């Protein structure tokens, strides 16, 4: 699963997920899966969607993952009183704003790409849409 090799700080503030996304255009492939909603994707969700796409296209073409989980989420164990510091890092998330391209694909027909992205979208907790690279 995806996570940073090393970070400057082990734990981060909760923060807010506001604003507009960077990476709103299909850059590498021909087809893309774009976020319509706002939320967080865990490393497990990113990997589950990638596997669903890869298996559907039977390893033909190429897939790019355009998001990376770089924010640690901490939690305290069950039945532990409050205080005594911040909990341990449990998992990593990528914060997603509307318009962000999550995955890209190339080298497969459009029908197959649509089906693969539809399978991937079912694994994700945010609303997404299928996009095609704009021809200049």
Swiss-Prot record:
The lineage of its organism: Bacteria, Pseudomonadati, Pseudomonadota, Gammaproteobacteria, Vibrionales. The keyword RNA-binding applies. Pfam families: Ribosomal_L16. Belongs to the universal ribosomal protein uL16 family. One of its GO terms (cellular component) is cytosolic large ribosomal subunit. It comes from Photobacterium profundum (strain SS9). This is Large ribosomal subunit protein uL16. GO terms for biological process: translation. Part of the 50S ribosomal subunit. InterPro entries: Ribosomal_uL16, Ribosomal_uL16_bact-type, Ribosomal_uL16_CS, Ribosomal_uL16_dom, Ribosomal_uL16_sf. CDD domains: Ribosomal_L16_L10e. Binds 23S rRNA and is also seen to make contacts with the A and possibly P site tRNAs. GO terms for molecular function: rRNA binding; structural constituent of ribosome; tRNA binding. Keywords: Ribonucleoprotein, Ribosomal protein, RNA-binding, rRNA-binding, tRNA-binding.
């Amino acid at each position: 699963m995806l996570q940073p090799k090393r970070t400057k700080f082990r734990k981060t503030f909760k923060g807010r997920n506001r604003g507009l996304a960077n990476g709103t255009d299909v850059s590498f492939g021909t087809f893309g899966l774009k976020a319509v909603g706002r939320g967080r994707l865990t490393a497990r969700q990113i990997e589950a969607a990638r596997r669903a796409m890869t298996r559907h296209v039977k390893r033909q073409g190429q897939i790019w993952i355009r998001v990376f989980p770089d924010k640690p989420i901490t939690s305290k164990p069950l039945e532990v009183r409050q205080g005594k510091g911040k909990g341990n890092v449990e998992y990593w998330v990528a914060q997603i704003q509307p318009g962000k391209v999550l995955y890209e694909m190339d080298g497969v027909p459009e029908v197959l790409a649509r089906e693969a992205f539809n399978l991937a979208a079912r694994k994700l907790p945010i609303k997404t849409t299928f996009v095609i690279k704009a021809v200049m």
